[in-house]
Amino acid sequence: WNSKGELFLQFRSRLKKNHPQTWDSSCSGHLSTGQDYYEAAIRELEEEIGLDETQTKAIRPVFKVKSCPETEQEHVWLYEMVHDGPFQLQAEEIEDGRFFSQNDIQKMISENPVQFAPSFVYIWNLYLRQQKS
């Protein structure tokens, strides 16, 4: 999120094996051996969008998603933070990135959901439901 309440999304590289050239969460990745979810989140923020250790201290856990078909059988921890950029995008992973309002994301999903990685749409909808409760 930025200070205007817009969410930064990455446009996945055309070289990605799964869901190339789709909009996805700001950062994502897998645990390395011996790492916990928080440590992996920090590592991915550094690798994918170039935030340093001092900038990543503001992340906070939101919720956990159990493995399911919608997450390709992966366990997911969702974290969030506020940062206005700029970001240094990892070219091998990300072709583009920009901030979107919640309304714009909803409209884009409604009009053309295939422009998003399927797991993003699933987790986005879980997030919106949680915010309403």
Show which residues each predicted segment covers.
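Short acidic/polar alpha-helix capping motifs at helix-coil junctions
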Residues: 8-10, 26, 48-51, 70-71, ...
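Alpha-helix capping at helix-to-loop junctions
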Residues: 46-54, 67, 84
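Nudix hydrolase/Nudix homology domain
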Residues: 21-23, 61-66, 70-133
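Conserved Nudix-box catalytic region and its N-terminal flanking loop in Nudix hydrolases
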Residues: 3-43, 47
